Each structure stands twice: as structure tokens, then as C-alpha cells.
């Protein structure tokens, strides 16, 4: 029995500096998936992370279901992944391996899997990273963000050249070079064009394209 998804379509990975619109792009894709112009809305799976700044300058980071309301049964402690204050202060690998893994593996055929974002905090979470690569090996469409570091540069839709040492963390480089991934280096100049390409890849053949405003 064939999957409801199209195995020929690439997964999408975005890589960009801060304040270039990657979160806005993902939120637009999520809204459009839910506002299907033809047929049923596309289910959203996966995770998004959010920072909450404290009065002492420390930002605490929590994991949430992608595009969804948080179940009241999931306490904040179970979603806490770490904190930063200019740099990483602490990390909770168990949250990635338990809650994060469960959110990734909840994805079902016919849906869209969001992973926003994958960075350096996950390096000691093997179960989570295994789930990430299983998703990239699979046919459920993935829209993910990989952490940007200085030196990351490649044309939109293209992987970095062989030998480039552009990503800290072997797993981040493996994500970018995965054979099923189409990598987009997002900038303020190309973000609208990238949005058009991403929505075409994810939605063509599934729902009518709709007019949209620039990001």
C-alpha cells in the first residue's frame, strides 16, 4: 500500500541568521496548511521552541507542539530544554529524548512535520537525533530549521560544497547534506522567493495554491 505522501519530494531545511524571517516563513506555511482551499486541512506535527526572557537577562527555552495548543497535561518542567544568557547556561537532554522524540514520532502520513529548530543543545540527546534522521529518511514532508553559525553560506536550495566546515556539530552537517534534503540559506533579500518555492514543494498536488502577501 502506497503512502499518501509523495516520496519524490525533498524535505526542506532552512538555515539563516536571526531576524531574517525563518520563523515567520514557518508560521505562514502552518497557517496555509490549515486553511486548505481544497479538501481537508493538512495536519501539523513536530515541535517549535520558544524563548522567555527573565528579568536577570536569562532566557529560558521551552518546547511546544508545532502550530498547536499545549495540552494542559504537559507541565512546563517536562518541556524545558535549557537556558541562555548570551551563551548556553544549561541544557536538559532528557526533554529532547522524551518529549521531543514523542512529538517527532507522532507524525502521520498526510501531515507536515515541523522541526524548529535543531541546534547545538541536542548533541547529548541520541534518541532525539535518531528520530530526526528517521524523519528525514521517511516520506512524511519535513520543514525544519537548522542552527545557523558564522560561515554558513550556500545558494538557496543547494547543499554546501564538499569540504566546507560550516556547521558546528556533525549531526547538523549531516542534516544539511542529507540526500532527501533541499537546503535554503534564507536572507532578507531572498525570503519571499524561498517562501514561494517551499510552498510549491509542500503543497503542489495536495491543495490549491492561494495568493499571499510578502513575508
Q: Language-model segments: which ranges?
A:
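Phosphate-binding P-loop
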Residues: 2-9
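Phosphate-binding/switch loop-helix module in NTP-utilizing enzymes
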Residues: 81-130
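Hydrophobic positions on the alpha1 helix immediately C-terminal to the Walker A/P-loop
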Residues: 25
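The conserved Walker
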Residues: 18
Amino acid at each position: 500500500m502506497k503512502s499518501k505522501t509523495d516520496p519524490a519530494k525533498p524535505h526542506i531545511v532552512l538555515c539563516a541568521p536571526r531576524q531574517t524571517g525563518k520563523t515567520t516563513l514557518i508560521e505562514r506555511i502552518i497557517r496555509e496548511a490549515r486553511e486548505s482551499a481544497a479538501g481537508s486541512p493538512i495536519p501539523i506535527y513536530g515541535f517549535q521552541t520558544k524563548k522567555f526572557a527573565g528579568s536577570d537577562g536569562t532566557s529560558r527555552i521551552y518546547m511546544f507542539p508545532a502550530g498547536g495548543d499545549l495540552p494542559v497535561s504537559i507541565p512546563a518542567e517536562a518541556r524545558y530544554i535549557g537556558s541562555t544568557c548570551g551563551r548556553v547556561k544549561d541544557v536538559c537532554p532528557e526533554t529532547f529524548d522524551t518529549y521531543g522524540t514523542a512529538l517527532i514520532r507522532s507524525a502521520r502520513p498526510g501531515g507536515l512535520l515541523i522541526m524548529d529548530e535543531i541546534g547545538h543543545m541536542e548533541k547529548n540527546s541520541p534518541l532525539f537525533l535518531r528520530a530526526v534522521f528517521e524523519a528525514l529518511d521517511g516520506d512524511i514532508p519535513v520543514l525544519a530549521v537548522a542552527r545557523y553559525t558564522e560561515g554558513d553560506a550556500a545558494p538557496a536550495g543547494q547543499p554546501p560544497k564538499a569540504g566546507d566546515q560550516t556547521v558546528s556539530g556533525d549531526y547538523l552537517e549531516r542534516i544539511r547534506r542529507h540526500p532527501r534534503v533541499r537546503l535554503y540559506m534564507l536572507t532578507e533579500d531572498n525570503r519571499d522567493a524561498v517562501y514561494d518555492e517551499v510552498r510549491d514543494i509542500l503543497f503542489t498536488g495536495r491543495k490549491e495554491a492561494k495568493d499571499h502577501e510578502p513575508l
